[in-house]
C-alpha cells in the first residue's frame, strides 16, 4: 500500500488553492471598483467583493491595493467581464462568468473544457433564461428558524427557504437589496454563515451514473480555469458523482 501525499505536498496544494481563490477575488474587487468607484459604502458590488475577500482572511492591505489599481492610483491590469453559456452532458445548463485580460485565451479554455467533457457551448442567452439572479444568505443547521424568519421579513427579504433534511435556512433577496438585508440581519444578531449574489436555476435536472460523473468533471474543470470567476448549473448530481 503506497503512502499518501506528504504534509508538505498537502500544504503546497492548499496554498495553491488559496492563491487561486485570492486571485479571483482580487480581480472581482478590481472590476467592481473600476465600474462603480473605490468606496465600498457607495458601491454595493464592491462591498460584496470586499466582504468575500475578508471572509477568506484576505488582508485589508491586499484589498486596498486591488482597489487602488482599479481606480488608477496604482498601476494595474484591466480585466473585462465575459459570460459564456452552454450545455453539459444530460442537457444540464451551465453559465460561466469570467474576468479576463485576454478574451481569445479565455474562450479557447472554456470551449476546450466543454468539448473534453462531452458538452457544448451555446450562444448568448441560450441558457440564462433558465436562471434567476438572487442574493442568498445561508444559515447552517441549528439556526433559530423563527428568529431568522422574523428578522428577514423585517429586513425586506423576498423569501425564506427552510430545508427539511437538515434545518438549514436560506434568506433570499434581490441583488439590489442584498447588502441592505445582510446588514440588517447582522444588526439583529443573525450573521449568515455564507452570503453571495448568485444564479439559481428555476428547475434542476437530476443526473446520475456516468452522466453525473461527466457533468461534475466539466464543472470542476471550468472552476479550475484561472479566468473563470463563477460557474452555475441546474444539475442535481447523484451521490455517485462524488464517489
Swiss-Prot record:
It is found in: Cytoplasm. InterPro entries: Integrase-like_N, TACO1_YebC-like_2nd/3rd_dom, TACO1_YebC_N, Transcrip_reg_TACO1-like, Transcrip_reg_TACO1-like_dom3, YebC-like. GO terms for molecular function: DNA binding. Its main location: cytoplasm. One of its GO terms (cellular component) is cytosol. GO terms for biological process: regulation of DNA-templated transcription. It holds the Pfam family Transcrip_reg. The keyword Nucleus does not apply. Belongs to the TACO1 family. PANTHER family: TRANSCRIPTIONAL REGULATORY PROTEIN YEBC-RELATED (PTHR12532:SF6), TRANSLATIONAL ACTIVATOR OF CYTOCHROME C OXIDASE 1 (PTHR12532). HAMAP family: Transcrip_reg_TACO1. This is Probable transcriptional regulatory protein Smlt3713.
Amino acid at each position: 500500500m503506497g503512502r499518501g501525499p506528504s504534509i508538505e505536498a498537502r500544504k503546497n496544494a492548499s496554498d495553491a488553492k488559496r492563491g487561486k481563490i485570492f486571485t479571483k477575488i482580487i480581480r472581482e474587487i478590481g472590476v467592481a471598483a473600476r465600474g462603480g468607484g473605490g468606496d465600498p459604502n457607495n458601491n454595493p458590488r464592491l462591498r460584496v467583493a470586499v466582504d468575500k475577500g475578508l471572509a477568506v482572511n484576505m488582508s485589508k492591505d491586499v484589498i486596498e491595493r486591488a482597489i487602488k489599481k482599479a481606480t488608477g492610483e496604482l498601476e494595474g491590469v484591466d480585466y473585462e467581464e465575459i459570460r459564456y453559456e452552454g450545455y453539459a452532458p444530460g442537457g444540464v445548463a451551465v453559465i460561466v462568468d469570467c474576468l479576463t485580460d485576454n478574451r481569445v485565451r479565455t474562450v479557447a479554455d472554456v470551449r476546450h473544457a466543454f468539448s473534453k467533457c462531452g458538452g457544448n457551448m451555446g450562444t448568448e442567452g441560450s441558457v440564462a433564461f433558465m436562471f434567476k439572479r438572487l442574493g442568498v444568505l445561508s444559515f447552517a443547521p441549528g439556526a433559530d428558524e423563527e428568529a431568522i424568519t422574523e428578522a428577514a421579513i423585517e429586513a425586506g427579504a423576498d423569501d425564506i427557504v427552510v430545508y427539511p433534511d437538515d434545518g438549514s435556512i436560506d434568506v433570499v433577496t434581490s441583488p439590489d437589496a442584498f447588502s441592505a438585508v445582510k446588514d440588517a440581519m447582522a444588526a439583529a444578531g443573525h450573521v449568515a454563515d455564507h452570503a453571495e449574489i448568485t444564479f439559481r436555476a428555476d428547475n434542476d435536472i437530476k443526473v446520475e451514473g456516468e452522466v453525473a460523473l461527466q457533468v461534475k468533471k466539466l464543472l470542476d474543470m471550468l472552476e479550475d480555469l484561472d479566468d473563470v470567476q463563477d460557474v452555475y448549473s441546474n444539475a442535481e448530481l447523484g451521490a455517485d458523482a462524488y464517489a
